[in-house]
């Protein structure tokens, strides 16, 4: 075997091994969590919980999504909808829901000046909490929950086992467009990362109110561009363990996702940690671009091998690599609960890899984030340096 062939072998192993290790460990933890279903935390205490839901614009299934959060089997909870302006398209919908569900209310927060609008909304909501609220739940307005979700996810806090819990979401693309399935693939992989290293990242997070106040989260949020990663860093610095329960994953309907919508989603996912968690971002960029390049090169080698243009070692090595890659992709499909057809899942994988690779590469050179109609320029730690109104089309109807 030549030096070049040895080099290719080592490179392929370096590019491939982290993915199956992460996927395998994450799936093992999910399996263990589900087998412990009978041993899950149970509490006969029902302290008051408030769910804070920042909302901007209306998704196609918005009313059904919000109703799922208003119809929880928990005897003592309130829901607070946080809206920037009375003119927001979601305002009338929220008014109707607050009329139908007396345990809900709407808070007009005004426009952010020194932080992300979502952070500004959440800070305003914190300042309007009921006196008796003991647990605060932060939940995105794009997530749908089962009726027993609030009871199950907050049980570890109510028993005193932990001070904070988090969960993620799975995307349900309808129809199964390439870009909707691509987003579901990315979320499946991200879910496994969060299972391995629990951290608030989309979905929902609950925290004991005393803990939240003690950590000074409001001060951090009031100058930062993002809420969940910032909260995760605060918890890490304080040495507070956060529990991730994969049985409480939320559903995010994803109707008719487009390439533009997918790229916009990926921009946020990749760019936020560039400022809040730069080491994680840099490692992810290197790993992902290396994997994307390895998939591209081995695909070319396989085509050349079929035409007799490369030797059998490189040809078969590339074939084995691609088979293993697609095997891992099929394992990821088991993480998504919505039975996306195999053909749609596999057909979306290569477009997902290369478009996401482009977004990762672009993130190296981009110094701003477009989010809900505003363009933010963050600095170290995610602190907002400046902001301006951006594309209004991107400002509404997008999952957080």
Positions of the model-derived regions?
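Long helical/loop segments within the catalytic core of UDP-sugar-dependent glycosyltransferases
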Residues: 96-129, 133-134, 152-219, 263, ...
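A conserved acidic beta->alpha catalytic loop
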Residues: 75, 83-94, 111-113, 143
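Cell-envelope/extracellular polymer assembly enzymes that use nucleotide-activated donors
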Residues: 47-50, 78, 230
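Short, acidic, metal-binding catalytic loop of nucleotide-sugar glycosyltransferases
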Residues: 67-76
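N-proximal low-complexity "stem/linker" segments adjacent to membrane-targeting elements
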Residues: 1-67
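Membrane-embedded multi-pass helical conduit in multi-pass membrane proteins
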Residues: 3-6, 21-32, 41, 287-368
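Catalytic donor-sugar/metal-binding loop of nucleotide-sugar-dependent glycosyltransferases
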Residues: 223, 229-251
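Acidic donor-binding/catalytic loop of UDP-sugar-dependent glycosyltransferases
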Residues: 139-156
């Amino acid at each position: 075997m030549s030096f070049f062939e040895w080099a290719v072998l080592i490179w392929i192993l370096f590019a491939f091994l982290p993915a199956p290790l992460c996927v395998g460990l994450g799936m093992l933890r999910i399996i263990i969590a589900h087998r412990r279903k009978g041993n899950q935390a149970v509490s006969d205490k029902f302290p008051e919980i408030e769910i804070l839901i920042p909302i901007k614009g209306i998704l196609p299934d918005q009313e059904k999504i919000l109703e799922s959060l208003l119809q929880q089997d928990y005897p003592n909870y309130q829901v607070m909808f946080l809206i920037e302006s009375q003119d927001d398209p979601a305002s009338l919908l929220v008014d109707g829901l607050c009329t139908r569900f007396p345990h809900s209310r709407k808070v007009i927060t005004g426009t952010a000046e020194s932080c992300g609008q979502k952070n500004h909304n959440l800070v305003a909501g914190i300042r309007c909490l009921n006196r008796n609220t003991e647990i605060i739940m932060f939940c995105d307005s794009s997530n749908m929950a089962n009726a027993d979700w609030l009871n199950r996810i907050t049980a570890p806090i109510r028993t005193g086992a932990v001070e904070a819990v988090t969960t993620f979401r799975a995307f349900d693309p309808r129809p199964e467009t390439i870009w909707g399935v691509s987003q579901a693939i990315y979320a499946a992989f991200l879910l496994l990362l969060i299972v391995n290293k629990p951290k608030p990242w989309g979905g929902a997070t609950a925290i004991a109110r005393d803990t939240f106040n003690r950590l000074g989260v409001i001060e951090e949020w009031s100058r930062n561009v993002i809420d969940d990663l910032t909260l995760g860093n605060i918890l890490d610095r304080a040495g507070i363990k956060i529990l991730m329960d994969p049985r409480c994953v939320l559903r995010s309907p994803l109707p008719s996702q487009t390439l533009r919508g997918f790229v916009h989603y990926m921009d946020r996912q990749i760019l936020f940690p560039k400022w809040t968690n730069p080491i994680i971002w840099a490692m992810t960029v290197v790993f992902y671009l290396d994997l994307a390049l390895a998939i591209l090169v081995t695909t070319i080698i396989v085509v050349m091998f079929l035409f007799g243009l490369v030797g059998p070692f490189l040809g078969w090595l590339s074939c084995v690599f691609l088979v293993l890659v697609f095997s891992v992709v099929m394992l990821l499909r088991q993480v998504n609960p919505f039975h996306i057809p195999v053909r749609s899942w596999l057909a979306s994988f290569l477009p997902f890899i290369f478009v996401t690779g482009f977004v990762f590469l672009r993130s190296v050179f981009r110094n701003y984030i477009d989010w809900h109609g505003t363009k933010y320029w963050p600095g170290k730690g995610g602190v907002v340096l400046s902001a301006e109104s951006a594309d209004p089309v991107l400002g509404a109807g997008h999952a957080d």
